[in-house]
Amino acid sequence: MPVGAPRHWRLRALVRNPLVLGGLVLVVLFCGVAALAGVLAPADPIAMNTAGVLEAPSPAAPFGTDRFGRDVLSRAMFGARSSLFVGIGSIAIAATFGSVVGLLSGYFGGRLDNALGRVMEVFLTFPSLILAIAISAALGLGIQNALLAIAVTYWPVFGRLVRGATMGERSKDYVQAARVVGASGARVMRHHLLPNVLSPIVVQVTVAISQAIIIESSLSYLGLGTQPPTPSWGTMINEGRTFLDTAPWISVFPGLAIMGAVLAFNFLGDGLRDVLDPRSGGMNG
């Protein structure tokens, strides 16, 4: 394995990077709210109150109430659970499966690489949102199927990324030395190649999570993801679309939550890219 930058140097660089710090603080904040929603939420997110329908934001209900009198702040907090669960969970699956496929394809090459490359190209031909909608519609309604649809949509992104990085590493001296001493292909990939292609994977994970949150919200908005009365940012925006003139807070606050979460993961990814891959010059979109 090649000798890279000392770990303490990278840690210092991460700590000093304002994008990493800012993004990490926001990510921890959103995840903390999602995890502690049951404690932090001021009201039951699905409890209806016919006496308090469409109330404007006030000290009693900081984000107002919806058409059923449900507290929008509480629903936004619990909605973070659904959106972040699908966003993080789907990308975790996609990154794991895609990395394995990319390592196999890039290391062995030949017919295996050609076959796997063709499969990835087919998936990558379609826009992510359109493909996720099609897969989710085929699988059926529900948060689990939405998670699976996004995972299937994004694994080729990681597969192509890791394949390219692996092909760039496999001819280097440390890989050849491992082969000479009799290391198996599995050992070379696990102990030598994977650690050296991990940086771009980590960066891509943070960026992909932000995109997955948008797709999950879109699926829920269309009725394919999280099902009512379980709150989700996408379903909340959909429920408030007919009240944009009279009660805009129903849609505005979950929309702001989506924007904040997406920016948080993008900031974190941009900062990680600056530190782990300075040659990239930051995010390019």
What spans do the regions from the language model cover?
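Residue-level signature of the transmembrane alpha-helical cores
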Residues: 23-26, 120, 149, 156, ...
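Generic hydrophobic transmembrane alpha-helix motif, especially the helices
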Residues: 62, 66, 96-168, 172, ...
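Short hydrophobic alpha-helical segments within the ABC transporter permease transmembrane module
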Residues: 72-77, 84, 119, 126, ...
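Alpha-helical transmembrane segments of multi-pass membrane proteins
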Residues: 30-34, 133-137, 150-156, 207, ...
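Gly/Trp-centered helix-boundary motif
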Residues: 1-99, 103-104, 110-114, 129, ...
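Glycine-rich helix-loop "coupling/hinge" segments at transmembrane-helix boundaries
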Residues: 124, 135-138, 150, 165-166, ...
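A short, glycine- and basic residue-enriched loop/turn
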Residues: 70, 132, 172, 177-178, ...
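Amphipathic alpha-helical segments that mediate coupling or scaffolding at interfaces
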Residues: 13-14, 76-79, 83, 104, ...
